A protein has these predicted regions:
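Glycine-rich FAD pyrophosphate-binding loop
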Residues: 33-53
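Residue-level detector of alpha-helix initiation sites
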Residues: 18, 22-23, 47-48, 115
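Predominantly flavin-linked oxidoreductase catalytic cores and closely associated redox partners
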Residues: 123-264
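Beta1/beta-strand and adjacent pyrophosphate-binding region of the FAD-binding site
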Residues: 8-24
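C-terminal helical "tail/cap" subdomain of flavin- and related membrane-associated enzymes
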Residues: 323-392
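A conserved beta-strand/loop capping segment in the N-terminal third of enzymes
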Residues: 62-119
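FAD/FMN-dependent oxidoreductases across multiple families
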Residues: 140, 157, 239-321, 328
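Conserved phosphate-binding and hydrolysis motifs of nucleotide-dependent enzymes
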Residues: 20-25, 168, 297
Length: 392
C-alpha cells in the first residue's frame, strides 16, 4: 500500500490522547468530560493494579477534585471507604529525638494505590465518554505537524490532535518527545513494603522519622486501612550514589534498631516483598511540553522535594492540561506558542512552591543544626504554624 502524503492523510482518530490512567491521566479525562472532544485514555496495565508509592492522598488533591465537581470528591470517598484511613495528624521525629505533631484541618487520607487509582478510573467511566484502553503498553510515540501517533505493542496506531503524557516517572512519552537526562540531585529513590500488627500507631496519624545518617530523606509509617501500614524509606539519589546506600538494608536496619520504631515493629509481619520506586523531583527546569504534547504529574517531574508526595501535583496538572487542551482544540492550534501557556500555568500554580521546597530540602540536608532548630521552634504554636505554612 503506498504511503499517504500529508495532504491525503486521514484526520486523527481522537482529539486528545492521554497516556497513563493514574491520578494525572484520570483527572485530565474527568476535566475533559462534557467538552465534546473525542478523548481516549490508555494504560499499559489492567485496573485494579498496584503502584509502588507511599499511598498518601494530600488535601490539595481532594480540593482540586471537589473544585472540578463536588460529586467527584464525594464518590471517591464512597468508592475508597473500605480501603482508606482518614488522616488528622502527622507525627515527626528529628534525628536527635525531638517530636512534633502537626494536626491538619483539611481532609486528607491514605489509601493503597491499588484501590485509589481504580476508584479514580471508575469516576472517569461514570462521568465521561472517554474511551478507555487497558492492557495497552506503547512502543513508540511520534509527533508530526498534523498529529501525534502512538504505536501500541499490539494493534493499530492511535492518532490524535494532542497528546497528554501522564505515564509516570518512567514516561515513554517524555523519554521520546522531551528527553531529559537523569539528574540525581533532583531525583529520589525509595523502597516500601506493607506491614500488619504495627504497634502504637493511631489510626489517623502518619509518622515521619528523620535519620542522622541519611538526612536528605526520611522513613515513614502510614496507616492505609484495615490494619495495614505502608512503611518505607527514601532519600536523594545523589546521596545514595555517593554513600553506596542499599535502601532495603537501611529500611530493615531502621525498623529493627531505631528507638522509636523497633518496639513498634517487634511483632509486625511484612506482607509481600519490599519494592522500590523513583521520584523525579519538581522545582527544576524540565520541559512540560513537546511537539503537540503536554506532560503531567511524575512524567513532568512534579513531585514535592520536601515532602515526597506527588498525587496532588499529578491531579492538579492533569486538570490544567485539560483546560489547555480545550483551548488548543477550539482554536485548532497546537503550535509551541499555543502550548506554552500550559507550562507557564503549571509554573505559577505549582512550580514556585516546588522550587522553594527543593532549596529548603537541600538546606535542611546540609545543615543538621537547622533541622533540630526547626523542631525546637515547632514546640511553640505560632512558630509551628509558620513552619507548616513555609513547608506547604
Amino acid at each position: 500500500m503506498p504511503e499517504l502524503s500529508a495532504a491525503a492523510a486521514p484526520p486523527p482518530i481522537y482529539d486528545v490522547l492521554i497516556v497513563g490512567a493514574g491520578p494525572a491521566g484520570a483527572a485530565c479525562a474527568l476535566a475533559l468530560g462534557g467538552s465534546g472532544l473525542r478523548v481516549v485514555l490508555i494504560d499499559k496495565a489492567r485496573f485494579p493494579r498496584d503502584k509502588v508509592c507511599g499511598d498518601a492522598i494530600p488535601s490539595p488533591a481532594l480540593k482540586a477534585l471537589r473544585r472540578l465537581n463536588p460529586q467527584y470528591a464525594d464518590e471517591l470517598r464512597a468508592l475508597t471507604a473500605a480501603h482508606r484511613t482518614d488522616m488528622a495528624c502527622s507525627r515527626l521525629a528529628s534525628p536527635a529525638g525531638a517530636e512534633v505533631s502537626v494536626y491538619w484541618q483539611d481532609p486528607a487520607f491514605n489509601s493503597p494505590r491499588l484501590h485509589f487509582d481504580h476508584a479514580l478510573l471508575e469516576l472517569v467511566r461514570r462521568h465521561t465518554d472517554t474511551i478507555i484502553l487497558e492492557d495497552c503498553p506503547i512502543r513508540n510515540v511520534e509527533a508530526t505537524l498534523d498529529e501525534v501517533r502512538v504505536l501500541p505493542a499490539t494493534g493499530a496506531p492511535l492518532t490524535a490532535r494532542l497528546l497528554v503524557g501522564c505515564d509516570g516517572a518512567n514516561s515513554v512519552v517524555a523519554r521520546q518527545l522531551a528527553p531529559w537526562p537523569l539528574d540525581r540531585a533532583r531525583h529520589c529513590a525509595a523502597v516500601r513494603a506493607y506491614y500488619t500488627n504495627v504497634q502504637d500507631t493511631p489510626a489517623t496519624t502518619s509518622d515521619f522519622v528523620f535519620l542522622s545518617r541519611h538526612r536528605a530523606g526520611y522513613c515513614w509509617v502510614f496507616p492505609v486501612g484495615g490494619g495495614l501500614f505502608n512503611v518505607g524509606f527514601g532519600m536523594l539519589s545523589e546521596d545514595i550514589a555517593r554513600q553506596q546506600v542499599d535502601l532495603k538494608v537501611v529500611l530493615d536496619e531502621v525498623l529493627a534498631t531505631h528507638p522509636r520504631l523497633a518496639p513498634r515493629f517487634r511483632q509486625a509481619q511484612r506482607q509481600g516483598k519490599v519494592q522500590g520506586f523513583g521520584l523525579p523531583l519538581g522545582g527544576g527546569r524540565r520541559p512540560l511540553t513537546a511537539p503537540r504534547t503536554l506532560l503531567c504529574g511524575d512524567a513532568a517531574a512534579l513531585i514535592d522535594p520536601l515532602q515526597g508526595h506527588g498525587i496532588d501535583q499529578a491531579i492538579i496538572s492533569g486538570i490544567l492540561a485539560a483546560e489547555h487542551a480545550r483551548r488548543c482544540c477550539a482554536a485548532d492550534d497546537f503550535s509551541p506558542t499555543a502550548l506554552a501557556p500550559y507550562a507557564a500555568h503549571v509554573q505559577r500554580r505549582l512550580g514556585r512552591d516546588l522550587a522553594r521546597h527543593y532549596w529548603l530540602m537541600r538546606l535542611l540536608a546540609r545543615a543538621p543544626w537547622l533541622v533540630e532548630a526547626a523542631f525546637t521552634a515547632a514546640q511553640f504554636a505560632p512558630l509551628r504554624r509558620w513552619l507548616v505554612r513555609l513547608m506547604g
